[in-house]
Amino acid sequence: MSHLLVYDFMEHDLANVLIVVKPSTKSLVFVSLSGTKPKLLGDAKKFVSKVNSLSKNKGSIYTLKNKSILKSDDVAWLEQLSFDFLQILAGGIDSQTNIKCEYLLGTEFQKKVWETTKTIKAGATISYQQLAVLLGNPKAVRAIGSALAKNNIAVVIPCHRIIGSKGKLTGFRWGIELKESLLRQEQAI
């Protein structure tokens, strides 16, 4: 079965952004931050390649296309999703919006970590240890850090709100400087 994925570029004061959506389910499946358009698109292509390598046994193939191929109904939906995403990035609305996420990669544990992370409101931070307790597994701190490092839907899954136990900003795929900027914008630090 063939699945269409569509990408769009956005610009924001904090970072250049590329989002990838699945129009058939109206879901956000991937976000990359910072870098040039070619780098961001390269990140998306690597993501789709990994999804395809894990999905081919199931008979699924994902194809990545520019948003220009969309029909007008889908363009309106994508424009709304893009607007909502930029509002989250700007700290204007919380990540618990009507942006539907679909995880094309990830174990059940990772997906549980990501869903729990989505509940952390803008302006708040918690430690990896606190997140482990929320998940009912206080000893899973390293596993949680690993799961967050594999988060493919930055900002909407707000892994930037997870900090070290002593309040130190640690681990963010797109850089500690961007993590700090996001938290300052949300008035969390």
From Swiss-Prot:
Pfam families tied to this protein: DNA_binding_1
One CC-aspect GO term: nucleus
Entry function: Involved in the cellular defense against the biological effects of O6-methylguanine (O6-MeG) and O4-methylthymine (O4-MeT) in DNA. Repairs the methylated nucleobase in DNA by stoichiometrically transferring the methyl group to a cysteine residue in the enzyme. This is a suicide reaction: the enzyme is irreversibly inactivated.
Name of protein: Methylated-DNA--protein-cysteine methyltransferase
UniProt binding sites for DNA: Y128, R142, S165
Keywords, comma-separated and alphabetical: DNA damage, DNA repair, DNA-binding, Methyltransferase, Nucleus, Transferase
Subcellular localization: Nucleus
Residues in coiled coil: none
InterPro entries reported in the protein's UniProt record: MethylDNA_cys_MeTrfase_AS (IPR001497), MethylDNA_cys_MeTrfase_DNA-bd (IPR014048), MethylDNA_cys_MeTrfase_DNAb (IPR036217), WH-like_DNA-bd_sf (IPR036388)
GO biological process, one term: DNA repair
Catalytic activity: a 6-O-methyl-2'-deoxyguanosine in DNA + L-cysteinyl-[protein] = S-methyl-L-cysteinyl-[protein] + a 2'-deoxyguanosine in DNA; a 4-O-methyl-thymidine in DNA + L-cysteinyl-[protein] = a thymidine in DNA + S-methyl-L-cysteinyl-[protein]
Protein encoded by which gene: MGT1
Entry's EC annotation: 2.1.1.63
Broad enzyme group: transferase
CDD domains in the cross-refs: ATase
